[in-house]
C-alpha cells in the first residue's frame, strides 16, 4: 500500500509538472529562443558607414579612391581604398568642420533613370571590377504590413486567449485555479495526533465536546432516534486558552479528517475568490465525511453585515453569505461538523449564530488554579525539574494566565536555566520567568537620583495603601528596577479566581491605583506624568462603575453603552447614543467625584502612615527590591495577614516612567 501511494503521488506530481509546463512553457526553451533572437538581431546589424554627398563620391572616384560600389534603388554604398577627409562644404549631414570618414560610405542616389547606367559605365572605364546592383529591399514594406495587419491580429488573439483562460478559471482550471482552491490544511493520520489527554485544565469544555466525538464515531446511534448533531460549534474565549488545540483534539479523538483554515485566508484581491474557496472547502469535506472543518478567527470573515463602511457588497460579505449557505446545505447523512474559534463573539453576524448553523456555543475561559497546575504538568513533561520546583505554588502565583502564557513561562524558565549552564530547571528559574512575563525584562540603565527617589515614593504609595486596605490585593513584590517600559513595579497577589467584585472592593482598588500619585503629592506637593497609566485604569474602573454596574446613586441602576466599546468604526456610526447630553454630563461628574474621593482617601491614609512611607522608600532606595516577607519585617503584618486572607493571584501596577508607562496583560485582564 505504501509503494502504491508513493507511485500515485509520484504520478500526480509528474502530471502537475507536465500541466505546469503546458501552461507556462519550459523556461529553458524560452530562454534559448530569446538568446537566438537577440544574437540574430545583434549580428545582423549593418556595418557602420559615413553619409556623403554624390559630388564628393564623384571626386573620390576621379581620384581613384573607390574600392567597391553597390548600386541600389534608393542608396549607393561602397568602400574607400583609404579613409579620406571630407571638407565641411561637402558634408551631407551639415557638419561645419572637416572630418575623417569611415572606410564604408553611402549617399542618396540622384534622381534620373539613367544614373545607374552612367555610373556603371564610369566604374568600368576606371577598371573598378567590384561593383554590383543590389536587389530591391522590401523590408520596410513587410514591416509596414506587419504593423498594420499583424499587430491588430495579435491583439485580437491575445484577448481571445485571455477570455478563454478566464472561462477555464471559472470552471476550476487555468493558472488562476489556485486562487479558487481552498487554503485549508488537512492534518493526516501521519501527523502528531492530539487527544483530550493533551488538553489540560478544561474539563468542562471537554465534556461538552465529547458528544461531538461520539457522533463522529457512531452517527447511527443518534440518527436512529431522530437526533441531529450540532452542525457547528463556536469556541469563544480569550486568546491563548486552547481553542485550536481543542478542535484538533476532537478530530484526534474521533479519528476523522481535520481541515484547518484561518478566516482571513478566504479574503483575497479578486472578487468572488473567497466564496469559491468556501465552496471548494466544503465540497472536499463532504467527499471525505465524516470530517471536521475548523475555521480559526472566524470574526475576520463573519462580522456583522452592513456594519462597516464598505456597504453590503464587499468581498467579505460575499464570503460570509457563502458560508451561511453551505452550513444550511448539509444533509442529515453528511457528518461534517464546523468548529469555529473567536475571541470576539459579540461582533459576529446573528445569522451565523442562529440554531441550525452554530448550534452550540462553548466558552473557553482562563483555567482555574487546579487547571493551571494540570497545564504545568503537561508542559514540564520533557523538562528536567529540580527537587524544589512546586507546581502548586506556580499555579497559585499565575492566576489570569492562559495555557499559552504558561507554556511561554515554562519555555522562558528553561532558556534561563540553559543560559546559566544548569542541568535542571529550578524554582528560581520559574520565578525569573514569571517576573519577566508579568513585569517585563530588567533594563540595564542608570536612573537619576531624583527619578529613582520619585519612583521609590510612588511604589511605596501603592504598596502602603494595599497593605492597610481590607479586600485589596496582597503585595507580593515591589521593585524600583526598571522593567519593560516601566521604571518600577508593584506586584500583587489578589484573591484566587474571583469573578465578581463589590463596590467597596472597587473603591479600594481605586485608592491603591491612586496611591502612587498621592505619595508624590505629599512629598513633592506636585505630581509627575508617571501616573498616567494609573489614571487611565482608575478612570476606566470608575466609568464602568457608573455606566455599567449601577454604583452611582445619582445615575441609578441604569446601564449606558459608551462609544469606546464599539469593536470597529462602522458599527459606531450606524448606532445612536442611548442617552442625552445632560446624562453624559452627569456621568462625567460622577466619574470625577468617585476619583476625587479615592484620591483624597489615598492621601489621608498615607499621611496617617507617613513614617511607614518613609521606611519603605528608604529601604527601596537601598535594596531596590522588597518582597512580602521583607515588608512584614519593616512595617509589620498586612491587614490580609491579620484577617487570614492569603490566597490569590499575581497582578501588577506600573510605576512612573513618563507618558510611555504600560499596563501588564495580567493586570489589564483583571481590571477589565
Swiss-Prot record:
Residue span of region Disordered: 1-22, 642-672
Biological processes per GO annotation: protein catabolic process; proteolysis
Keywords: ATP-binding, Cell inner membrane, Cell membrane, Hydrolase, Membrane, Metal-binding, Metalloprotease, Nucleotide-binding, Protease, Transmembrane, Transmembrane helix, Zinc
Cofactor note: Binds 1 zinc ion per subunit.
List of residues binding Zn(2+): 458, 462, 534
Listed EC numbers: 3.4.24.-
Membrane topology term: Multi-pass membrane protein
Gene3D superfamilies membership: 1.10.8.60, P-loop containing nucleotide triphosphate hydrolases, Peptidase M41
Cell compartment(s), UniProt: Cell inner membrane
Tree of life domain: Bacteria
Location of the active site: 459
InterPro entries, sorted: AAA+_ATPase, AAA_lid_3, ATPase_AAA_core, ATPase_AAA_CS, FtsH, P-loop_NTPase, Pept_M41_FtsH_extracell, Peptidase_M41
Cofactors required: Zn(2+)
Periplasmic side, ranges: 45-141
Entry's Gene Ontology cellular component terms: plasma membrane
Summary of the function given for this chain in its UniProt record: Acts as a processive, ATP-dependent zinc metallopeptidase for both cytoplasmic and membrane proteins. Plays a role in the quality control of integral membrane proteins.
Record family assignment: In the central section; belongs to the AAA ATPase family.
Subunit structure: Homohexamer.
Protein name: ATP-dependent zinc metalloprotease FtsH 1
Protein source organism: Rhodopirellula baltica (strain DSM 10527 / NCIMB 13988 / SH1)
Gene symbol of the encoding locus: ftsH1
Amino acid at each position: 500500500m505504501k509503494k502504491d501511494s508513493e507511485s500515485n503521488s509520484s504520478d500526480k506530481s509528474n502530471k502537475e509538472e507536465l500541466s505546469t509546463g503546458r501552461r507556462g512553457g519550459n523556461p529553458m526553451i524560452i530562454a534559448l529562443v530569446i538568446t537566438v533572437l537577440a544574437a540574430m538581431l545583434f549580428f545582423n546589424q549593418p556595418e557602420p558607414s559615413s553619409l556623403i554627398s554624390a559630388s564628393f563620391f564623384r571626386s573620390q572616384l576621379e581620384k581613384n579612391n573607390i574600392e567597391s560600389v553597390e548600386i541600389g534603388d534608393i542608396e549607393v554604398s561602397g568602400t574607400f581604398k583609404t579613409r579620406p577627409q571630407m571638407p565641411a562644404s561637402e558634408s551631407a549631414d551639415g557638419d561645419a568642420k572637416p572630418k575623417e570618414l569611415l572606410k564604408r560610405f553611402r549617399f542618396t542616389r540622384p534622381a534620373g533613370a539613367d544614373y545607374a547606367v552612367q555610373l556603371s559605365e564610369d566604374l568600368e572605364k576606371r577598371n573598378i571590377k567590384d561593383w554590383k546592383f543590389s536587389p530591391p529591399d522590401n523590408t520596410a514594406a513587410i514591416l509596414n504590413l506587419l504593423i498594420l495587419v499583424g499587430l491588430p491580429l495579435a491583439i485580437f488573439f491575445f484577448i481571445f486567449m485571455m477570455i478563454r483562460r478566464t472561462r477555464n478559471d471559472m470552471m476550476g482550471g487555468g493558472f488562476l485555479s489556485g486562487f479558487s482552491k481552498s487554503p485549508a490544511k488537512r492534518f493526516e493520520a501521519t501527523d502528531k495526533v492530539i487527544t483530550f489527554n493533551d488538553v489540560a485544565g478544561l474539563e468542562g469544555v471537554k465534556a461538552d465536546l465529547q458528544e461531538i466525538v461520539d457522533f463522529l464515531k457512531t452517527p447511527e446511534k443518534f440518527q436512529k432516534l431522530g437526533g441531529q448533531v450540532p452542525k457547528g460549534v463556536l469556541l469563544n474565549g480569550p486568546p491563548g486558552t486552547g481553542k485550536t488545540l481543542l478542535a484538533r483534539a476532537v478530530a484526534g479523538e474521533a479519528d476523522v479528517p481535520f481541515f484547518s483554515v484561518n478566516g482571513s485566508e478566504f479574503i483575497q484581491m479578486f472578487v468572488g475568490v473567497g466564496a469559491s474557496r468556501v465552496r471548494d472547502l466544503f465540497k472536499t469535506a463532504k467527499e471525505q465525511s465524516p470530517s471536521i472543518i475548523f475555521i480559526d478567527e472566524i470574526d475576520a470573515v463573519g462580522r456583522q453585515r452592513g456594519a462597516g463602511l464598505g456597504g453590503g457588497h464587499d468581498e467579505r460579505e460575499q464570503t460570509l453569505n457563502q458560508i451561511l449557505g453551505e452550513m444550511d446545505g448539509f444533509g442529515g447523512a453528511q457528518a461534517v461538523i464546523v468548529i469555529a474559534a473567536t475571541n470576539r463573539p459579540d461582533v459576529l453576524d446573528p445569522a451565523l449564530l442562529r440554531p441550525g448553523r452554530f448550534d452550540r456555543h462553548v466558552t473557553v475561559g482562563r483555567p482555574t488554579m487546579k487547571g493551571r497546575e494540570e497545564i504545568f504538568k503537561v508542559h514540564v513533561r520533557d523538562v528536567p525539574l529540580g527537587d524544589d520546583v512546586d507546581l502548586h505554588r506556580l499555579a497559585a502565583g499565575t492566576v489570569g494566565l492562559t495555557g499559552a502564557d504558561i507554556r511561554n513561562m515554562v519555555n522562558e524558565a528553561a532558556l534561563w536555566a540553559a543560559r546559566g549552564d544548569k542541568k535542571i530547571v529550578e524554582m528560581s528559574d520559574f520565578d525569573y520567568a514569571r517576573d519577566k512575563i508579568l513585569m517585563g525584562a530588567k533594563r540595564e540603565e542608570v536612573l537619576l537620583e531624583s527619578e529613582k527617589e520619585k519612583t521609590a515614593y510612588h511604589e511605596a504609595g501603592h504598596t502602603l495603601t494595599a497593605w492597610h486596605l481590607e479586600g485589596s490585593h496582597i503585595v507580593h513584590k515591589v521593585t524600583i528596577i526598571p522593567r519593560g517600559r516601566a521604571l518600577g513595579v508593584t506586584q500583587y497577589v489578589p484573591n484566587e479566581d474571583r469573578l465578581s467584585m463589590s463596590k467597596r472592593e472597587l473603591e479600594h482598588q481605586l485608592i491603591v491605583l491612586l496611591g502612587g500619585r498621592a505619595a508624590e503629592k505629599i512629598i513633592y506637593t506636585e505630581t509627575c506624568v508617571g501616573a498616567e497609566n494609573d489614571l487611565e485604569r482608575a478612570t476606566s474602573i470608575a466609568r464602568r462603575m457608573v455606566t455599567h454596574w449601577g454604583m452611582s446613586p445619582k445615575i441609578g441602576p441604569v446601564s449606558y453603552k459608551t462609544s469606546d466599546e464599539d469593536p470597529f468604526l462602522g458599527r459606531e456610526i450606524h448606532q445612536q447614543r442611548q442617552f442625552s447630553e445632560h446624562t453624559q454630563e452627569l456621568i462625567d461628574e460622577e466619574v470625577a467625584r468617585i476619583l476625587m474621593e479615592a484620591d483624597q482617601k489615598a492621601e489621608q491614609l498615607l499621611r496617617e502612615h507617613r513614617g511607614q512611607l518613609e521606611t519603605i522608600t528608604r529601604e527601596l532606595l537601598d535594596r531596590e527590591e522588597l518582597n512580602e516577607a521583607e515588608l512584614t519585617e519593616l512595617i509589620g503584618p498586612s491587614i490580609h495577614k491579620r484577617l487570614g486572607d492569603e490566597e490569590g493571584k499575581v497582578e501588577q501596577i506600573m510605576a512612573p516612567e513618563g507618558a510611555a508607562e504600560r499596563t501588564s496583560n495580567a493586570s489589564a485582564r483583571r481590571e477589565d
